[in-house]
């Protein structure tokens, strides 16, 4: 089997770790066993012909599992559509890494900005939220839609003077100069009606240790004073002379608000931002969240992110698999549907086809499904090792989703 399909990544796991789980589930299936055996035999023969020696298990690792890659990282906090290429399909993944349209749904909290732009970062600032109102918030739908200059977050995988931005952040050092803005496109932005409501389950981030506060002080000049831009279309429509937004500084947290937060503690709930955005490749959702906060003279950080769609693969179109389809269903069921998707693409309704395939296979011939969490072959050991190394790298670098 070769081609492209999509699977839903859950929150709380890196894209690479999740892909390796999927890879192991497919590799141990009978569906792919013949192809893997053929590739292994060819590699053995090639190695022995070139070296005159027998190939070790280590030399055969690369061909002893399903060849796989993904078409765009989702960071651990994010869930949603992850495009997967298998076999020769991995060559088509480049088409998904740039120039694609993606749709995201995000939730964020007003009143705090963080180093990473999300719930896992250190607090940079606390700001007032008492002035916020829904009518003003709805204006961001126009202000940010169109061609937009956007400053990437400092934890993005970018470099300055040969040094990754995240290294400056991790060392608590100021950047040599401001981060250059990038041109992106926001095709559509919808703010949902539950925005500014407080009936949610997200506790507000609170300041931690004094040491952490000192560490981020050096970054404030670079991260809090980034230039805010409105879209080219908005500025032209309203006859503005520059795309640089003329918005006053965020309101500081009032003494009354501070007392309220202290009094309510973990039960305090900040007003929520809830929106859906249709964006180009290169758009940083965290930066959009932060910019919306600044445009409202407050601050904002992300608590939830779902990639609803990438090109034609969409959760709303039901053409996306789940990992449990491969780990809990009989492979006679999922293999039939997977083959159809690889042949026909995103037009296939995966959920409907799985239901049909289940009905077509008699219960007495269904195979026993072994949990993918059970210890397996040597490829599994490599999977765990690779995933752990990737997770360690993620902890250090805090790679932020670039969509």
Swiss-Prot record:
Q: What class of enzyme is it?
A: isomerase
From the record, give the cysteines joined by S-S bonds: none
Instruction: Tell me one GO biological process term.
Output: tRNA modification
Catalytic reaction(s) noted: uridine(55) in tRNA = pseudouridine(55) in tRNA; a uridine in mRNA = a pseudouridine in mRNA
InterPro entries associated with the record: PsdUridine_synth_cat_dom_sf, PsdUridine_synth_N, tRNA_psdUridine_synth_TruB
* EC number(s) reported in the record: 5.4.99.25
Tell me yes or no: is Transmembrane among this UniProt entry's keywords.
Answer: no
- Where in or outside the cell is it found? Nucleus; Mitochondrion
Record keywords, A-Z:
Isomerase, Mitochondrion, Nucleus, tRNA processing
Can you quote a single GO CC term? mitochondrion
List the molecular function annotations (GO) for this entry.
Answer: pseudouridine synthase activity; RNA binding; tRNA pseudouridine(55) synthase activity
Name the catalytic site residues: 75 (nucleophile)
As for what it does, the entry says: Responsible for synthesis of pseudouridine from uracil-55 in the psi GC loop of transfer RNAs. Also catalyzes pseudouridylation of mRNAs with the consensus sequence 5'-GGUUCRA-3'.
Q: Which PANTHER family is this protein grouped with? A: PSEUDOURIDYLATE SYNTHASE TRUB1, TRNA-PSEUDOURIDINE SYNTHASE
The miscellaneous annotation reads:
Present with 3990 molecules/cell in log phase SD medium.
Which family, according to the similarity comment? Belongs to the pseudouridine synthase TruB family.
What name goes with this protein? tRNA pseudouridine synthase 4
